[in-house]
């Protein structure tokens, strides 16, 4: 049986937001994992601990042949050898035209966004909606000539675009409607939905006949994660053993957690499939059949293996030596904690503070929230490569080693 990895030829790829969490991992994959071959780019992980020993990623994902460029607002951090870097503002057509004239990309992968917890509504709309519109129009040639023609545009949307942040979601597919307006309580999700719609409507509508698609990651985590993994470990570091035994809800709620490397892989697959589709259109062949179409489509991306929310949380704690056995758990009902969270928000809000316990955190800890990724499997050929438990070990190991190194530096 052959062990040769498949190869994807992608031409010149511009990763927008390539110095961010997901963007960095996409660049790493496009460059065939310099993080595993170049000591200057290595991801920190604890040494001599079997819990944090895992096989190399470069032997498991397809090999990419690509020239890689990155544009970000600032590119001084999270750089990888082998990519070229450009500072740029996606809300400025002039700024983007200068980058496109220098790079001349065949493919754009657009991951740039403010943090999901960002409460600045004008910033979210300016970057996620106006910035995406500017970027897709520049890529498609509608904002001026930059000396080339972009063939494919992959947008990183969010699984939250179909969620009202309150309802349970059970094996949800891409046919569910986008949630906006009064029903959408998360403004971030509303702006991502608006941006996704802009990108998909632009499919084959530009002067360059550029094809587009959108990916909707669910529950992203992994090395360099500053949301789920970091916050879960921050809580366990500060909480007493008694507090760690407290569980919001019954832990009967399945939840999607998706390793960042698998999400990056879905982006490279989408880019590859779009290139093939663009060539098909350009050569005068018929349009793809509806059940195989990639362009103009949105795709859920998951690990295809939802887990119980608190099992994932306690597994992260256990990797740092803080083990909570099932018989030690104290279940706290959502019906009681939700109102308490509301009171805490009101009281501390008057003081300009945000409580740890909010109605949002209570609901998220107790809701069922997982998606079907069958469409990505059938049309993109996507399969999660790294399982949930390995992804968690990678994510936790990164945080643990980063904190150890920071402690050593502080002690000097």
Residues covered by each model-derived region:
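NAD(P)H-binding glycine-rich loop region in Rossmannoid oxidoreductase-like domains
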Residues: 77-79, 87-130, 134
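Conserved C-terminal active-site "lid" loop/helix of NAD(P)H-dependent oxidoreductases
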Residues: 260, 267, 285-288, 298, ...
């Amino acid at each position: 049986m052959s062990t040769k990895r498949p190869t994807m030829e992608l031409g010149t790829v511009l990763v927008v937001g390539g110095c961010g969490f997901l963007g960095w991992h996409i660049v790493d994959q496009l460059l065939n994992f310099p993080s595993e071959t170049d000591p200057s780019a290595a991801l920190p992980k604890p040494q001599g601990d079997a819990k944090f020993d895992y096989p190399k990623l470069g032997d498991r994902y397809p090999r990419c042949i690509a020239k890689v460029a990155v544009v970000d607002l600032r590119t001084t951090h999270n750089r990888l050898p082998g990519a070229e870097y450009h500072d740029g503002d996606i809300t400025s057509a002039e700024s983007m035209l200068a980058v496109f004239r220098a790079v001349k990309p065949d493919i754009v992968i657009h991951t740039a966004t403010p943090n999901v917890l960002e409460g600045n509504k004008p910033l979210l709309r300016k970057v996620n909606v106006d910035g995406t519109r500017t970027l897709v129009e520049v890529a498609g040639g509608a904002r001026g000539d930059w000396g080339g023609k972009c063939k494919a545009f992959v947008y990183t949307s969010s699984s939250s675009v179909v969620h009202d942040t309150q309802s349970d979601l059970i094996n949800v597919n891409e046919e569910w409607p986008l949630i906006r307006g009064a029903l959408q309580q998360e403004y971030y999700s509303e702006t991502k939905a608006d941006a996704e719609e802009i990108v998909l409507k632009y499919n084959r509508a530009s002067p360059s006949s550029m094809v587009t698609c959108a990916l909707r990651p669910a529950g992203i985590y992994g090395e360099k994660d500053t949301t789920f993994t970091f916050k879960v470990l921050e809580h366990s570091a500060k909480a007493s053993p008694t507090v760690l035994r407290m569980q919001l809800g019954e832990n009967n709620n399945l939840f999607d957690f998706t390793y960042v490397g698998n999400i990056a892989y879905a982006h490279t697959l989408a880019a590859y499939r779009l290139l093939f589709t663009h060539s098909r259109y350009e050569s005068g062949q018929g349009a793809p059949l509806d059940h195989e179409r990639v362009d103009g489509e949105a795709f859920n991306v998951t690990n295809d293996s939802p887990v119980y929310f608190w099992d994932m949380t306690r597994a992260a704690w256990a990797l740092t030596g803080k083990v909570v056995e099932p018989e030690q758990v104290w279940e706290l009902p959502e019906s009681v904690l939700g109102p308490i969270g509301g009171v805490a928000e009101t009281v501390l809000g008057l003081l300009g503070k945000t409580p740890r316990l909010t109605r949002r955190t209570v609901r998220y800890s107790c809701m069922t929230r997982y998606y079907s990724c069958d469409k990505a499997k059938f049309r993109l050929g996507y399969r999660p490569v790294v399982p949930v438990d390995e992804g968690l070990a990678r994510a936790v190991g990164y945080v643990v080693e980063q904190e150890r190194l920071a402690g050593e530096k502080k002690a000097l």
